[in-house]
């Protein structure tokens, strides 16, 4: 009985073979009888006892421990019914899908299956072929897995970014981006080329999310080599840390967050090493630092809120900045509050600045977790799997700039410091460096201080400066490498301000040849006819007067030396009339004839007499003949001087006048006459002072003649200006053949200044060039003055939006050459300063 009780309590032994007992076999406990080994109660035979699965005889006392009876093998498991219901529901949904949706679903299924197997799917393979390959790989006892590990699968795992070749515009259901947007691939490839740089394009939320615009950015990032991608990331890092204003930082933040939003909407795998994912953490700190430049204690103070100190404390916690000092015993409470702040939805904050910074912090935390996990796992990683606050769902493209700049301009307070800081915060700010310190007290090895001259250069505090470049001709010295023709624009580049800051500089490849030649001709004629503009008309007329008077005074001084008491012949009078009709073109004759005087001495006196009889053009610094007789000059330079040698030294006198004129050109004031003018006037005064005593009785006649001379000079100047304007208009409207025709002798003096510079002054290789505005990194000469646009040039801006430089067209007759500008010259180059914003790099 004792043995039976133990067995009853312990149940059957572990070595008891139930299968043998069921089939009638003899077990190891066969020495015991059937009744001794097992006791069955009334109504329960052995088969029912075994089928019930009871392991101990006291099951009647523990009925609640009795297991349920096993179902028949032919009946399906309970979960099979659930799968049938799910498949039936899914089948109904598939019936509602269209052909395009079904194609997208096939691509998604193929991508998921390939991702589950850990290998790269073939884009061209059909889903059925892919399924068969996957099934065969499962039934090959890991042979396929080993081959993948040593073949193409190893290359896939060594990739720095997940493969997104199967994510196409069609598979994602996207549209092509509008044609008015710049090409993303060209923007990234030509990011260091100033010619192809455009203003940032304003793109809407629908265009960014529903087109393939950002998908092209992502694919280009994946295709870049690791070295180029790292350089691009460093460029972005410096751009974020050196942003000139809060507006730029907010725009960069929206750019990064929009890129992440696109990945979340279309469920793209994240590349933790691309441009925008790598720099999202810097955006958070840059935004907080820019906001912290303002008076946050006043900006965050809202009526009815918790106070500015509490809101500022929350703002610092969002940016993971050290909390502000709190009272004793409040460290744990501050830590708990910061934990709650980081887990709150971004839009749950009541202040717009807090919401904007919370959105950036949430995106940065998601990407940071993915970047840390990518160091240990191969991925792929998706934004949806790490968004625990719903920040990616609540964000809309451009939301950061909207939250910040909808609140800051409307802030009103009585704090003067807050208003000054807010004004600076809403506009780009520049450096206020007044002096640069340099240590010149370095000691010698003997210990004595030695004063040295400054060697440190002042930092570039104004990086936004336009850079000018010019293209030299073939005859000049090649010290500066010329820029390529494709990067050349006009000498006065115009940017349409009505286009919202867009760059209207066209591409030479898309411009017709006629339009190209037309603007080339216009660019050259504009430098010749500088006096057509209203701003520089007076200055150019004064310059023309000084230049034309230079040649006339030389001939007049030579006539005085030969004999001023000779009378005028009728031929001289007739030549004077002809030259008066032709304008001031004949003024350059004295210089040409004086150079030929040594070879042809017999013709020098005639030519000088013809030149002396010519009346000078009007000028503010050239007095009339009568006024020169009445007003002797009081300056030492205009005092009477002895007569020059009669006719034996005309060349020496000419050289002396030219040398003195060149020396005086760089030291005289803008309103002062040149040396040639003063000496010519002094020669006239000395010659006329001898005959002034005999002509004193006719002073009234001289006054009347003076008035008539002034009227004639005024009429002549008006006629010349009108003819000059007509000439400029004809040149702008002329064809290429008309522009190539040589200029006849009866033309006006509109191009006299350029021709006379070539005759009177030696050609300088530095000045023989055609200036065109470009962004090539070349320094502008200090003698060139840069002027802003005048309001009166609006019509000219509309007419000449884009001017091109054609290297095949050379200046005609060497007329278009810019002389070296001195501090007193009035030759002014008009340059457009709107290109300064393009030289920030």
UniProtKB/Swiss-Prot annotation:
Write out the biased-composition intervals (Basic residues): 514-526
Check the record and name the Pfam families matching this protein. Answer: Herpes_UL69
Q: Where is the composition biased (Pro residues)?
A: 66-79, 614-623
Q: Where is the composition biased (Basic and acidic residues)?
A: 495-507, 553-563, 641-657, 708-731
Provide any one GO MF term from the record. zinc ion binding
What stretch or stretches form a coiled coil here? none
**Source superkingdom:** Viruses
Q: Where is the composition biased (Low complexity)?
A: 32-49, 132-147, 568-579, 591-603, 688-699
Query: Where does it primarily localize?
Result: virion
Q: Where are the zinc fingers (CHC2-type)?
A: 298-418
Which InterPro entries does the protein's record reference?
A: ICP27-like
Listed A to Z, the keywords are:
Host cytoplasm, Host nucleus, Metal-binding, Transcription, Transcription regulation, Virion, Virion tegument, Zinc, Zinc-finger
Protein's cellular compartments = Virion tegument; Virion; Host nucleus; Host cytoplasm
Can the keyword Transcription be found in this entry's annotation? yes
Q: Which residues bind Zn(2+)?
A: 298, 411, 413, 418
Family to which the UniProt record says this protein belongs: Belongs to the HHV-1 ICP27 protein family.
Record's function text: Immediate early (EI) protein that plays many roles during productive infection including regulation of viral gene expression and nuclear export of intronless viral RNAs.
What is the protein name stated in its UniProt record? mRNA export factor ICP27 homolog
Q: Which organism does this sequence originate in? A: Murid herpesvirus 1 (strain Smith)
Q: What high-level taxonomic lineage is stated for the organism?
A: Viruses, Duplodnaviria, Heunggongvirae, Peploviricota, Herviviricetes
